[in-house]
């Protein structure tokens, strides 16, 4: 079995790497290289500054007789796929005969968590795979081969993607919302994140001018076979493909003991202590300053689209101990290093007290001030000194041991929904370990 892997065939203006892969596979089949198994949809580090949208690469398993020149076929086919030309794209395309080499495995493990240099990636695999196109997308292409090696030992999910006819690209998607809701009712939680948990908005139809009509995610592939029959559309579905993927597996998260070891643009899991009161900033976002066990400080931020996670961050108090996972942004002249929170687990809540007037010892009612420096008095005639105010514990809105997360509409492709963990459909996330 041979492999063809590619990345960076799309741009903000259009295109889609998974669609390019589907078209490539059709060209390969026509040339005599038959598809074997499911194509792989591999999400990479979501914090790469120059990514287009979802930062995805694709790997295609094929069985090709010796007479088929796979490199020539895929190169010719890729030129057709990007014939309209997106100047921002720098495709990477690699062909591997047989099982991908071990070096690809390490590239995947790093590419899903860090930013890699394309030139160094090419050098690392030059002797083991055939590099057909060596643009910036070579990182994702080689990483996709690495995922092909490790997926049997890693958690996987699946996505069924329906594609539009080209004449509909850039127009409003014609999918019957009622059929999506019925599909969700009958298949959830095996399929997940079809609807937003807050307001029920449909999430499976993208808002970009790409060729995707809709995409449905699942913890098992069989249910995706019936999606095209259940989800009704008022435009033709020209292709439908089920991909095996690392989506919703938290593969991007890295457990880090201290901030000094966390790389900018990585996705660390950090244990922190809140040191200042949360503050709201313009736009409805919430920021709070924290520190690690060495006293190194960092801001954590929750943005308005992620509410109610914003309210979770707003409910924190100095002294609270938390575990956070998210995107680590570098320091700028205006802002310190900041973790954009994906998930937050409460480890320990600080006791918060509110100072109140004393309670009358005779009638058990709250006393009132008797005047400046005159202590307190009660309507029954009882009095109390100035220093008799009492501290009353304030109930906290948060709960120790609970992991809070962004809602589906704001969830990253790689981020694991905690409710699937609670239902036993996915393994515990790094925040729970």
From Swiss-Prot:
Compartments it resides in: Cytoplasm
Where mainly located? Answer: cytoplasm
* HAMAP family, alphabetized: tRNA_Ile2_agm2C_synt
What name does this protein carry? tRNA(Ile2) 2-agmatinylcytidine synthetase TiaS
Instruction: Name the catalysed reactions.
Output: cytidine(34) in tRNA(Ile2) + agmatine + ATP + H2O = 2-agmatinylcytidine(34) in tRNA(Ile2) + AMP + 2 phosphate + 2 H(+)
List GO terms (cellular component aspect).
cytoplasm
EC? 6.3.4.22
Annotated disulfide bonds: none
Keywords assigned by UniProt, alphabetized: ATP-binding, Cytoplasm, Ligase, Nucleotide-binding, tRNA processing
Q: Which family does it belong to?
A: Belongs to the TiaS family.
């Amino acid at each position: 079995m041979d492999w063809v892997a590619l990345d960076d065939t799309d741009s903000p203006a259009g295109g889609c790497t998974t669609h390019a892969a589907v078209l490539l596979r059709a060209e390969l089949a026509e040339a005599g290289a038959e598809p074997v198994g499911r194509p792989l949809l591999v999400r990479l580090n979501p914090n790469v500054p120059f990514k287009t949208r979802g930062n995805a690469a694709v790997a295609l398993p094929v069985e090709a007789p010796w007479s088929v020149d796979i490199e020539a076929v895929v190169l010719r086919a890729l030129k057709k796929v990007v014939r309209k030309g997106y100047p921002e794209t720098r495709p990477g395309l690699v062909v591997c005969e047989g099982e991908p080499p071990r070096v690809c495995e390490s590239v995947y493990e790093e590419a899903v968590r860090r930013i890699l240099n394309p030139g160094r990636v090419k050098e690392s695999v030059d002797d083991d795979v055939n590099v057909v196109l060596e643009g910036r997308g070579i990182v994702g292409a080689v990483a996709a081969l690495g995922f092909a090696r490790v997926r049997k030992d890693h958690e996987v999910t699946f996505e069924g993607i329906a594609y539009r006819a080209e004449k509909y690209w850039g127009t409003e998607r014609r999918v019957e919302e009622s059929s999506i809701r019925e599909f969700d009712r009958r298949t959830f939680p095996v399929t997940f994140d079809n609807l937003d948990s807050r307001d029920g908005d449909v999430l499976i139809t993208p808002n970009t001018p790409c060729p995707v009509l809709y995409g449905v995610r699942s913890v098992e592939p069989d249910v995706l076979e019936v999606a095209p029959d259940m989800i009704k559309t008022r435009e033709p579905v020209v292709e439908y493909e089920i991909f095996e993927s690392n989506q919703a597996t938290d593969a991007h998260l890295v457990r880090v003991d201290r901030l000094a070891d966390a790389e900018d643009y990585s996705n660390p899991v950090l244990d922190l202590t809140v040191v200042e009161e949360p503050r709201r900033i313009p736009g409805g976002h919430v920021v709070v300053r924290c520190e690690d066990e060495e006293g190194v400080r960092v801001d954590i931020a929750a943005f308005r689209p992620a509410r109610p996670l914003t309210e979770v961050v707003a409910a924190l108090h100095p002294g609270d101990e938390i575990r956070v996972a998210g995107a680590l942004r570098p320091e700028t002249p205006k802002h310190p290093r900041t973790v954009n929170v994906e998930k937050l687990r409460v480890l320990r809540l600080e006791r918060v007290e509110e100072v109140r007037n004393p309670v009358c010892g005779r009638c058990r009612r709250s006393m009132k001030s008797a005047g400046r420096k005159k202590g307190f008095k009660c309507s029954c005639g009882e009095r109390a000194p100035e220093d008799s105010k009492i501290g009353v514990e304030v109930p906290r809105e948060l709960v120790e041991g609970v992991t809070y997360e962004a809602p589906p509409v704001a969830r990253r492709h790689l981020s694991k929904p905690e409710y699937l963990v609670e239902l036993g459909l996915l393994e515990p996330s790094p925040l729970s370990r």
